[in-house]
């Protein structure tokens, strides 16, 4: 029997958090907020299957994310998903599969599956201390950007996201959207909708945020949350391009003020954008969190 998949709602947060806590991961997709916000833009639904959390992408041929839960529950869920695909006469496929996930599959089903990693989806993981201090020769250029910002904008200030400034951040985000052609680009528009909803629901989603000002004017903000016990994930970062150094400044200040209780910071993937990839690599990630797509060897079975 095919389980009933539903779109995640705010009232599902406790349930989904419960399953994510059973299988901690440094993959940026493994938070309720990420699932909830992006399900508004894409056809992703969830179900509980054999006591494992399963997401299904209904816009991409009914593929499934690697199940979340304890190992025995994950294996039972995988068996059921394979049977569902067989009954529906469709190819079995899993997305968002980490090397650790695939290693477990190889143990259960040796030689039956292949994985193809997508470099565009790999998350950049950094040492928190290095992002905060920017110490060392390799990050000298980043320190220069910070110093330049301080010289150009001596009235700058940093503050945590709060009820007192969230509406001003929302208005800044609207200006950013209008000046960056988001209305004419479906991908940019979807990402902007996620940004706006992140601000609107920052308390309900358990977000921390940071705000950068030049005088009274907000020139940058960022939003993120705990991913697992040793890793914080930054979901959103917006700055005005004409404010020189605003991006590196909000990055550094946010980590220094909000993330020092964590060993690592996940700054998500680069989506294959060359400029974004160059920038993320320039901060010297300690490793990349790889994710891939799994299919059966030999196709449908």
Where do the protein language model's features map onto the residues?
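Short, extreme N-terminal leader segments that mark the start of a protein/domain
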Residues: 1-21, 292, 298-301
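Aromatic (often tryptophan-rich) hydrophobic motifs at membrane interfaces
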Residues: 207-297
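Short catalytic-loop micro-motif centered on adjacent basic/acidic residues
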Residues: 93-94, 159, 264-267
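Short, glycine/charge-rich beta-strand/loop segments that flank catalytic centers
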Residues: 90-108, 119-122
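Conserved active-site alpha-helix within GNAT-family acetyltransferase domains
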Residues: 101-115, 144, 271-288
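Short, conserved active-site entrance elements at the starts or edges of catalytic domains
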Residues: 164-217
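Conserved donor-binding loop and adjoining core beta-sheet/short helix segment
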Residues: 18, 29-100, 213-243
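Acyltransferase donor/substrate-recognition loop-hinge adjacent to the catalytic core
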Residues: 110-183
């Amino acid at each position: 029997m095919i389980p009933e998949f539903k779109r995640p709602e705010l009232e599902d947060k406790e349930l989904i958090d419960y399953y994510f806590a059973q299988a901690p991961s440094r993959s940026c997709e493994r938070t309720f907020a990420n699932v909830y916000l992006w399900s508004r833009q894409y056809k992703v639904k969830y179900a509980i299957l054999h006591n494992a959390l399963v997401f299904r992408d209904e816009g991409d041929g009914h593929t499934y994310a690697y199940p979340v839960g304890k190992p025995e529950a994950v294996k039972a869920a995988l068996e059921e998903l394979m049977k569902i695909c067989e009954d529906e006469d469709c190819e079995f496929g899993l997305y968002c599969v980490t090397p650790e996930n695939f290693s477990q599959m190889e143990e259960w089903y040796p030689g039956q599956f292949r994985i193809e990693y997508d470099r565009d989806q790999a998350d950049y993981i950094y040492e928190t201390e290095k992002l905060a201090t920017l110490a060392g020769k390799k990050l000298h250029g980043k320190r220069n950007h910070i110093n330049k910002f301080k010289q150009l904008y001596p009235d700058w200030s940093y503050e945590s996201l709060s009820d007192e400034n969230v509406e001003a951040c929302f208005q800044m985000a609207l200006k950013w959207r209008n000046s960056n052609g988001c209305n004419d680009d479906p991908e940019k528009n979807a990402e902007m909708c996620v940004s706006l909803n992140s601000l609107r629901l920052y308390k309900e989603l358990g977000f921390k945020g940071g705000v950068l000002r030049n005088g009274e004017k907000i020139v940058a903000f960022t939003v993120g949350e705990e991913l697992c016990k040793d890793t914080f994930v930054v979901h959103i970062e917006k700055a005005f391009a004409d404010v020189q150094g605003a991006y590196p400044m909000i990055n550094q200040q946010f980590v220094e003020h909000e993330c020092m209780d964590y060993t690592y910071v996940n700054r998500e993937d680069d989506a294959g954008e060359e400029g974004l990839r160059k920038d993320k690599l320039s901060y010297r990630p300690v490793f990349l969190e790889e994710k891939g797509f799994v299919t059966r060897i030999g196709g449908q079975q």
